[in-house]
Design a protein with these regions (language model features):
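A short, surface-exposed alpha-helical micro-motif characterized by mixed small hydrophobic
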Residues: 186-188
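Conserved ABC transporter NBD signature motif
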Residues: 56-71
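Catalytic Walker B motif of ABC-type/P-loop ATPase nucleotide-binding domains
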Residues: 145-148
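Conserved ABC ATPase "signature" region
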Residues: 93, 97, 103-120, 139
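Helix-to-loop junction immediately C-terminal to a conserved catalytic motif
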Residues: 52
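ABC ATPase "signature
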Residues: 204-205
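Conserved ABC ATPase signature
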Residues: 124-128
Length: 232
């Protein structure tokens, strides 16, 4: 069995009397891609914020695989993490330095080339396209990556490039947790799906298991059935 990188149990977040996250459990194992899906306002993004410490939880426990995990966690919440005035290469070298690792120019160029960024090695990050910026934010070899709608607002080519990069990260040994409303994207990328509705997990499993268990033919039907949007 694969090692557990993240174990979140009983997460609760209240805004006044409303529980936007209501007892959510989430487990992430090494080398797996987990898609967190659900309608707008279901609690997906808030759950990620609680796990990352960006918002204070009202209840629950979060355990990572090691105490100094932060240097090995990559985060991309709607906007990509980078330093706009630094070149793509200098951003990569800084990411490495933050993880206490030396990165030579040659190594940096090779990494950027592998991610389709060879032509912008010396370009300021602020001048990169949206798709290039998102790729730059994911190339520093994290062990665990959190992505909130990583392909939102991108053109078809950029979406394809980000999907390929996510799959490459997983193939290289990273675990990825991402939110998405695109069921085609979820089907192509996810090893496991967690569906949230009204702040609770209502379904969890592999795509194949969920389709079989709920007797539907595709993930779009599954989504509509379990969120109640099929009756809307």
């Amino acid at each position: 069995m694969k090692n557990v990188l993240l174990q979140a149990t009983g997460l609760v977040k209240r805004y006044g009397s409303r529980r936007v996250v209501n007892g959510i459990d989430l487990e992430v194992r090494e080398k797996e891609v987990v898609a967190v899906i659900g309608p707008n306002g279901a609690g997906k993004s808030t759950t990620l914020d609680l796990i990352l410490g960006l918002k204070r939880k009202d209840a629950g426990n979060i355990t990572y695989w090691r105490e100094d995990y932060k240097a090995q966690v990559g985060v991309q919440l709607q906007t990509a993490p980078f330093f706009p005035k630094l070149s793509a290469l200098d951003n990569l070298k800084l990411f490495a330095a933050l993880r206490k690792r030396k990165l030579s120019v040659e190594e940096g160029v090779q990494i950027l080339e592998r991610c389709g960024l060879r032509e912008v090695v010396q370009t300021e990050a602020a001048r990169l396209s949206g798709g290039q910026q998102k790729r730059l934010g994911l190339v520093h070899h994290p062990k665990l990556v959190f992505l909130d709608e990583p392909t939102a607002a991108l053109d078809p080519r950029a979406r394809r490039e980000i999907r390929e990069l996510i799959r490459r990260l997983a193939d290289d040994g990273a675990s990825v947790v991402f939110t998405s409303h695109d069921m085609e994207e979820v089907g192509k990328l996810a090893d496991r799906i967690v569906l949230i509705r009204d702040g609770r997990v209502v379904a969890e499993g592999t795509p194949e298991d969920l389709l079989h268990r709920h007797e539907v033919e595709n993930l779009e039907e599954l989504y509509l059935k379990l969120t109640g949007e099929a009756d809307a």
